[in-house]
């Protein structure tokens, strides 16, 4: 029983279990019935994605890429300045302190001890993506990660 942090649309691990999409929007141009078949997600949980206002603010500051559903929540790797990234991290962590989000994170952490789960986003680079922050938040809550799953791929948040 364990948790993985994944890129949505990537090939599934054999023991991955339920894949949860923590993105603001579902994949553009993909019929709902194909989300799981095409390895996006089994369950959509936008509650654990950055809010629309935070995404707009981060895009304006250059911390995240503007674009369609695939880019929603994608933080630029390399080109993002660290101050913008730190601001994004601080504000996203604050959003995840809301009772509904905090309880959901607690639930996922607890479930990781009872079943196999995966949480993901579309971003290619986890180090500059909200899923790296979710990884930290779930680690802080005692989530059981899959063997070989990095606990902290590149500590970027403050």
Kindly label every feature range from the protein language model.
Residues 1-158:
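Residues lining hydrophobic/aromatic ligand-binding pockets adjacent to catalytic sites
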């Amino acid at each position: 029983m364990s948790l993985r942090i994944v890129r949505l649309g990537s090939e599934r691990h054999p023991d991955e279990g339920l894949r949860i999409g923590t993105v603001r929007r579902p994949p553009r141009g993909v019929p709902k019935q194909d989300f799981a078949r095409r390895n996006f997600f089994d369950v959509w949980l936008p509650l654990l994605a950055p809010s629309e206002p935070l995404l707009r603010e981060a895009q304006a500051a250059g911390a995240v890429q503007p674009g369609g559903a695939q880019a929603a929540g994608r933080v630029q790797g390399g080109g993002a300045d660290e101050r913008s990234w730190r601001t994004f991290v601080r504000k996203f962590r604050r959003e995840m302190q809301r009772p509904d989000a905090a309880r959901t994170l607690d639930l996922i952490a607890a479930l990781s001890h009872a079943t196999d789960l995966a949480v993901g986003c579309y971003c290619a680079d986890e180090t500059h993506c909200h899923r790296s922050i979710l990884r930290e938040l779930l680690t802080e809550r005692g989530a059981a990660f899959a063997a070989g799953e990095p606990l902290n791929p590149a500590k970027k948040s403050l």
